[in-house]
């Protein structure tokens, strides 16, 4: 009996204290920032990768984004038939970066972060929804305010106030928007009829960016820096409302916006990116996420990918899909580097930019003596 009990205890001990396979040298050790060392925001952000959970995913996103920014064609093996001139130019060939975001992020203060990126030409292609276009212009005309998620809808409606999460947009803002945009539509229609101008969503957005002429607008900077902005859902929002009311005032063949030409232009951004690598940063899900990923499928996948959203994959939505699902479609390269950060982009994206784009901009300014 004693022998049997000893065997049982030994077995239990063996189960409880099962010998581990060594992780030394194969995995990063977990440890957070030590505030005894003082307050150093850059070191704090760098410590995210070893903190664990979504902090580590955010840290990985920072690393991958910096890899996008640092990649040069000269890092890759030189092909045998490469001319001397081509060899010299390889250092100047950078990664093409696609940035996608949903409209609520322009309603929020992330707009200013995106404006910074477009102002300094840090991204190459933008994709958003209609709200991501109109809210940028509306903010040049009137303010959005901080409210509460719990404000009663019926009460707000009676006061002419619209709620976006815990943001409040007075309905008067849209009246100002109509007063601003309708005369531009009138002129666009004249140019369509007299000059055979073919308007596409991206061409219309560039025109509006020119007309707003306001440095707080990311679309102004996109126009100024010739950064294409694609929005295949251009009618799904206040701009669609304005197009509808404009058509009522202009019966017959009114203003035409051709989305097919933009599909061609968007796909060509990816198809003809080579020899560049492509990187994608997508805030939120829905149309911007799929549109960017689908274009990159044309080149057998993006080389770098960062997703930041709170959507889950369990309903089969594209919004919630992890990067590995995109790999199965050829939207992210099977050899690419990708991460999803499960976090509100209003928290994660400014932190990411602080430790990637902004750091590199600051270093470049110091080198150039600015």
From Swiss-Prot:
Cofactor: NAD(+)
GO molecular function: deoxyhypusine synthase activity; homospermidine synthase (spermidine-specific) activity
Keywords: NAD, Transferase
NAD recorded as keyword: yes
Pathway(s) this gene product operates in, as recorded in its UniProt entry: Alkaloid biosynthesis; pyrrolizidine alkaloid biosynthesis
Enzyme nomenclature, EC number: 2.5.1.45
GO cellular component: cytoplasm
Catalytic activity: putrescine + spermidine = sym-homospermidine + propane-1,3-diamine
Domain of life of the native organism: Eukaryota
NCBIfam families in the cross-refs: dhys
Subunit structure: Homotetramer.
Function according to Swiss-Prot or TrEMBL: Catalyzes the transfer of an aminobutyl unit from spermidine onto putrescine. The resulting polyamine homospermidine is a precursor in the biosynthesis of pyrrolizidine alkaloids.
Family: Belongs to the deoxyhypusine synthase family.
Protein's name in the database: Homospermidine synthase
Species whose genome carries this gene: Senecio vulgaris (Common groundsel)
């Amino acid at each position: 009996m004693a022998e049997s009990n000893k065997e049982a205890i030994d077995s239990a001990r063996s189960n409880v204290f099962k010998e581990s396979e060594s992780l030394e040298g194969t995995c990063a050790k977990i440890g957070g920032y030590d505030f005894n060392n003082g307050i150093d925001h850059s070191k704090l952000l760098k410590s995210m990768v070893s903190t664990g959970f979504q902090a580590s995913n955010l840290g990985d996103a920072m690393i991958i984004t910096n890899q996008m920014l640092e990649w040069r064609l000269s890092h890759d093996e030189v092909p045998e038939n490469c001319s001397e001139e081509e060899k010299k130019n390889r250092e100047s060939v950078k990664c093409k970066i696609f940035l996608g975001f949903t409209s609520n992020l322009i309603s929020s203060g992330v707009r200013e972060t995106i404006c910074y990126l477009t102002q300094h030409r840090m991204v190459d292609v933008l994709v958003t929804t209609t709200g991501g276009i109109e809210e940028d212009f509306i903010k040049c005309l009137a303010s959005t305010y901080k409210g509460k998620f719990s404000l009663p809808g019926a009460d707000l409606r009676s006061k002419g106030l619209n709620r976006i999460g815990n943001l409040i947009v007075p309905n008067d803002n849209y009246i100002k928007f109509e007063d601003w945009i309708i005369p531009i539509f009138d002129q666009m229609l004249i140019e369509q009829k007299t000059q055979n101008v073919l308007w596409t969503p991206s061409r219309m957005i560039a025109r509006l960016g020119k007309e707003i002429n306001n440095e707080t607008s990311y679309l102004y900077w996109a126009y100024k820096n010739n950064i294409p902005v694609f929005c295949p859902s251009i009618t799904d929002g206040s701009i669609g409302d304005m197009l509808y009311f404009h058509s009522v005032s202009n019966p017959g063949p009114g203003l035409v916006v051709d989305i097919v030409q933009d599909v061609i232009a968007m796909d060509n951004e990816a198809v003809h990116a080579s020899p560049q690598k492509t990187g994608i940063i997508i805030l939120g899900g829905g149309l911007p996420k799929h549109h960017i990923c689908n274009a990159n499928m044309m080149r057998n996948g993006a080389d770098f990918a960062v997703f930041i959203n709170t959507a889950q994959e369990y309903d089969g939505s594209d919004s919630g899909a992890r990067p590995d699902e995109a790999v199965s479609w050829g939207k992210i390269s099977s050899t690419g580097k990708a991460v999803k950060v499960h976090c509100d982009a209003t928290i994660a994206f400014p932190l990411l930019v602080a430790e990637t784009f902004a750091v590199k901009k600051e270093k470049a300014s110091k080198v150039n003596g600015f």
